[in-house]
Swiss-Prot record:
Matching InterPro entries: aa-tRNA-synth_I_cd-bd (IPR045462), aa-tRNA-synth_I_codon-bd_sub2 (IPR020751), aa-tRNA-synth_I_CS (IPR001412), aa_tRNA-synth_I_cd-bd_sf (IPR008925), Glu-tRNA-ligase_bac/mito (IPR004527), Glu-tRNA-synth_I_codon-bd_sub1 (IPR020752), Glu/Gln-tRNA-synth (IPR000924), Glu/Gln-tRNA-synth_Ib_cat-dom (IPR020058)
Protein name per the record: Glutamate--tRNA ligase
Subcellular location field: Cytoplasm
Location of the motif 'KMSKS' region: 244-248
């Protein structure tokens, strides 16, 4: 069997969607597993909606996920160009070939005529199909026209999908669709077929919303004299309400999850499990995915996107990283929030205590910004724990900290336990006012970690501030 040549062909009309990213991932894994070629092609024929910013977002999203391409707009290759708008002559040549061979024809019907026919079909409550008005007319390139593909009027087309199995489409549900507009721009099916033929694509893996296009495309491959590639139609990704995943379900772009502080390893891991499985294993390294991935293990039923599960996967990946690696990768998020963090022992300690408590780098910043910013007191915590009753506790702990040469765990533990014993209180009754004074809230890592991260001078300053607030 020939080595696979697969492609990811997004339209640059917005961000890289989670669904598109999974399609790219499955293609990339298949190519890498089998020593094949992963091609990136940009389908930018919608000139009004296509933007360079969207192209850049696609590039950035794929690179962040670690999905490198072997051929594409920026890296070149033997089958370019890789933007559809730069391939119009190629489409024209193939359309003219079909006309010469009687497999396509010029349609001179005006928009008004076609609109009237659609309205009549709607009034009669039937689906509009082009009636073949121009099917037998001679080709006159001087007249305004589009090119239509000639579909057989009887019979059916069957193909075996790698995910869904055999699929049959009767020709009677198809119509002589437009393949080339009057301005020379191809319609989706024809553009995709010509590109796949001329780029030697031999496996097309895409979302199953394209299943209905496949019979049409196979007819076009055959009309052009080429074997059709194999097809694998991937199950849809749904939101929690079992409708197609969209913005109303929350973030749906790859870059949004990057900005929220997800690891690319975790996003890849979660996306590949939306429709594919390998036994009961949940977490996979990149090498394991390349080794195990096979389209035969892709399920045919839609996957439900669960952001909590994705956050769990990310948390598991974060816990695999060393303190040093955590700090290095968390640093840009603290800096983006305007916090004066650096890749140093302090940040490594912050990440060490965050490891079990926060699931994303965004949560690291949200939950632990008080290590780098002035305390923002929670009003309820302030009213409950910064009172005249707790003043003696805060004063005693402050004095004890001031007397320590270093904030070592054993010394801090003795200080807090001695103070609790002296007052006949549980340890929590002593620690909680100190916690509120140092962090602004009632939930934090262990008090000894908090003190060690803040350092002696900053801890004393915050305790002094709390005492001033009490008055």
């Amino acid at each position: 069997m020939d080595k696979p040549r697969v492609r990811f062909a997004p339209s640059p009309t917005g961000y890289l969607h989670i669904g598109g990213a999974r399609t790219a991932l499955f293609n990339w894994l298949w190519a890498r597993r089998n020593g094949g070629t992963f091609v990136l092609r940009i389908e930018d024929t919608d000139r009004e909606r296509s933007t360079q910013a969207a192209v850049d977002a696609i590039f950035d999203g794929l690179r962040w996920l670690g999905l490198d391409w072997d051929e594409g707009p920026d890296v070149g290759g033997p089958h370019g160009p890789y933007f559809q708008t730069q391939r119009l002559e190629i489409y024209k040549t193939h359309a003219e070939k079909l006309i010469r061979e009687g497999k396509a024809y010029a349609c001179y019907c005006t928009k008004d005529v076609l609109d009237a026919q659609r309205k009549q079909a709607e009034a009669e409550k039937r689906q509009f199909r082009y009636p073949g008005t121009c099917r037998e007319l001679p080709y006159d390139p001087s007249r305004p026209h589009v090119i239509r593909f000639r579909v057989p009027q009887t019979g059916s087309k069957t193909f075996v999908d790698l995910v869904k199995g055999p699929i049959e489409t009767p020709y009677e549900v198809l119509q002589d669709e437009v393949i080339l507009r009057g301005d020379g721009v191809p319609l989706y099916n024809f553009g995709a077929v010509v590109d796949d033929v001329t780029m030697a694509i031999n496996l097309v893996a895409r979302g199953d919303d394209h299943v209905n296009n496949t019979a049409r495309q196979i007819l076009m491959y055959e009309a052009l004299g080429y074997p059709a590639p194999r097809f694998a139609h991937l199950p849809m990704i749904l939101g929690a309400d079992k409708t197609r995943l969209s913005k109303r379900h929350g973030a749906t772009s790859v870059t949004a999850y990057r900005d929220m502080g997800y690891l690319p390893e975790a996003v890849v891991n979660y996306l590949v499990r939306l429709g594919w499985s390998h036994g009961d294993q949940e977490l996979f390294t990149r090498d394991e995915l390349v080794r195990f991935f096979d389209f035969k293990d892709v399920g045919a039923t839609a996957g439900v996107f669960n952001q909590d599960k994705m956050a769990w996967v990310n948390h598991e990946w974060l816990k695999k990283l060393s303190d040093e690696e955590l700090a290095r990768r968390a640093l840009p998020y603290f800096q983006a929030a305007g916090l004066p963090a650096a890749d140093d022992a302090k940040l490594r300690h912050v990440c060490a205590v965050a490891r079990e408590r926060a699931r994303t780098f965004g949560e690291y910043v949200q939950q632990f910004r008080y290590f780098y910013a002035p305390v923002q007191l929670d009003p309820k915590a302030k009213d409950k724990f910064l009172t005249q009753d707790t003043r003696p506790i805060l004063e005693a702990i402050r004095a004890g900290i001031a007397a320590l040469e270093a904030l070592e765990t054993a010394a801090l533990e003795k200080l807090f336990h001695d103070e609790a014993a002296k007052r006949g209180l549980g340890l929590g009754k002593v620690a909680q006012p100190v916690r509120v004074a140092l962090t602004g809230g009632t939930a934090s890592p262990g008090m000894y970690d908090v003190l060690q991260i803040l350092g002696k001078d900053e801890a004393l300053r915050r305790l002094d501030d709390a005492l001033r607030i009490i008055g």
